[in-house]
Amino acid sequence: MSMQDPIADMFTRIRNGLSAEKEVVSVPFSKMKMEIANFLVNEGYIKGCSKGTTLAGHPSIEIELKYHAGAPVIEMIKRVSRPSLRIYKSHEELPKVYGGFGVAIISTSKGLVSDRKARDLGVGGEIIGYVA
């Protein structure tokens, strides 16, 4: 049986890893998930990410989770647009996550950007998810 929403699965693995206080979580590899992981590194929500392989030889992404004073840096990570219901917004309609303290991950024609950067560039796109 195939996975219906790989990005939602990635977010769930990160959430579960944080609640179990894991240092590293592994997710199956895809270019989009690697882009999202690099985005989270650049925004400071995770320590790092690297491409690896599972014991079965399948490519995977190793995500190093980040904690501050014993508490997870990521308080909330949520999938918004999903395969059965895509959510697109123009740059004027982009939401502020947690009153501007969080970040919306937006897939635009300029690549994967934060909601702030999309507003600055004047581009809209698909809202992949929210992180705070």
Swiss-Prot record:
GO terms for molecular function: rRNA binding; structural constituent of ribosome. The keyword rRNA-binding applies. Signal peptide: none annotated. Keywords: Ribonucleoprotein, Ribosomal protein, RNA-binding, rRNA-binding. One of its GO terms (cellular component) is ribosome. It holds the Pfam family Ribosomal_S8. The keyword Lipid biosynthesis does not apply. InterPro entries: Ribosomal_uS8, Ribosomal_uS8_CS, Ribosomal_uS8_sf. PROSITE patterns: RIBOSOMAL_S8. GO terms for biological process: translation. It comes from the Bacteria. PANTHER family: 40S RIBOSOMAL PROTEIN S15A. Part of the 30S ribosomal subunit. Contacts proteins S5 and S12. Belongs to the universal ribosomal protein uS8 family. One of the primary rRNA binding proteins, it binds directly to 16S rRNA central domain where it helps coordinate assembly of the platform of the 30S subunit. This is Small ribosomal subunit protein uS8. It comes from Francisella philomiragia subsp. philomiragia (strain ATCC 25017 / CCUG 19701 / FSC 153 / O#319-036). The lineage of its organism: Bacteria, Pseudomonadati, Pseudomonadota, Gammaproteobacteria, Thiotrichales. The gene is rpsH.
